[in-house]
Structures are given as C-alpha cells and as structure tokens.
UniProtKB/Swiss-Prot annotation:
Belongs to the LpoB family. It comes from Klebsiella pneumoniae subsp. pneumoniae (strain ATCC 700721 / MGH 78578). This is Penicillin-binding protein activator LpoB. A lipid is attached at C20 (S-diacylglycerol cysteine). The gene is lpoB. Residues 37-48 have a biased composition (Pro residues).
Length: 215
C-alpha cells in the first residue's frame, strides 16, 4: 500500500514538472506592428541674413593751423626813399617847355605796377609835397580829388588806374594838366615813371623816370 502511494506521488510530480516545462517553452505572443502615419516634415522658416555693416573709417580731426605769428617770421616791410626819387623828376618837369604858368594840375595817385607789394600812398604823399609851393602849377586839392573820385564810385585812397579815368576827372575839376605816375619793375628796386599830359588833347608834354632806393 505504501508503494502504491509512493508511485502515485512520483507520477503526479512528474506530470507537474512536465506541465511546467511546457509552459516555459510556449513563445510569448507577438504583437503585430502597426505602421504609424508619418507626419510631413515642417519646413523650417528661413531667417533673413543681415548684411554685415562695413566699418566706418576713423574721421580725421580738424586741421589745426599753427600760429603763423609764432611759427613763421613776419613779412618784411620795405621802406623806400620816395623823396629822393621824386625831387629830381619834379625839377625836370617844371623846366619842361610848353607849360603855361598858373595852370591847374591834377596829381593822380601813384600806381603800383611792380611784381610785389609796396605802399604807393607814401609815394603819392612825397610827390605832392615836392610840388607844393612850385611857381608853375596850382594843384587840385585832395578834397576836390576825393569828391571827384566818389562820383566815380572810388574811395579817396584808390588810384584812378588808367589814363582815361585820370583825364575824365581832370575835366570834371577843371584841370589843364594831369600828372600820371607808376612804380614799375622789381619791388626790391622799383622804378618811378611819370608823364605830364595835356587834358584838352591827351598829348604827353613831358615824361621821365628814375630809380627808387630802399632805405
């Protein structure tokens, strides 16, 4: 009786183990893969490229001028012996023939025709001083000449600049003669040229020239 029970127990255990082995050998269920719908790729928005800004070159600063007074020598001021130049020329003119004593003479300002700058006003002053008190001509006063120049739109210091203007003013002030003078040549050694003209005809009665020395 005991043997039968042992046999039955062994048989039952063998069946149980065989069942467990069968359960282990069964494959796991395979799930069918379902295709997923593909989403269309979203286009990436294009980002506009910003052009590179060119670099601005550094602007030069304001140009600073050096003080000309301290950095450069002052221009040379020339002084001339106008009295020494006009005295002999006036003496020659007063000895000229064909000049009626007591005639009215217009002395035009000396014109600067040199290649540089000079004070022609000093030459005019020296010329009028040399003629002052002569016994042959009566000079048109500086006031009369200034008024006549203003009528032409000129300042009293302006030279008439041409023989035709000098003759026109001489007629306006009632002068019979005009003394027309130029400083010419090199400004370092100018030459003074003078012409005495008859207003009525424009004839040159006398002419002369002389060197002007620097002082």
């Amino acid at each position: 009786m005991m043997k039968m029970c042992r046999y039955a127990l062994i048989t039952a255990l063998a069946i149980f183990l065989a069942g467990c082995a069968g359960l282990r050998e069964q494959p796991a269920p395979v799930e069918e893969a379902k295709p997923q719908p593909q989403q269309p790729a979203q286009p990436q928005p294009t980002v506009p490229t910003v052009p590179a800004v060119p670099s601005v070159p550094a602007q030069p600063g304001p140009i600073e001028h050096q003080d000309q007074q301290s950095g450069q020598p002052a221009p040379r001021v020339r002084h001339y012996d106008w009295n020494g130049a006009v005295q002999p020329l006036v003496g020659q003119m007063l000895q000229a023939s064909g000049v009626n004593a007591g005639s009215i003479l217009l002395v035009d300002s000396v014109n600067n025709r040199t290649n540089g700058s000079l004070n022609a006003g000093e030459a005019t002053t020296a010329l009028r001083s040399a003629l002052a008190g002569n016994g042959k001509f009566t000079l048109v006063s500086a006031q009369q000449l200034a008024v006549a120049k203003q009528q032409l739109g000129l300042s009293p210091q302006d030279s008439l600049g041409s023989r035709s203007k000098a003759m026109g003013i001489a007629r306006n002030v009632g002068a019979q003669y005009v003394l027309y003078s130029n400083a010419t040549g090199n400004v370092n050694a100018p030459e003074l040229k003078m012409q005495l003209m008859l207003v009525q005809t424009g004839e040159i009665i006398w002419s002369g020239k002389g060197a002007v020395q620097q002082q």
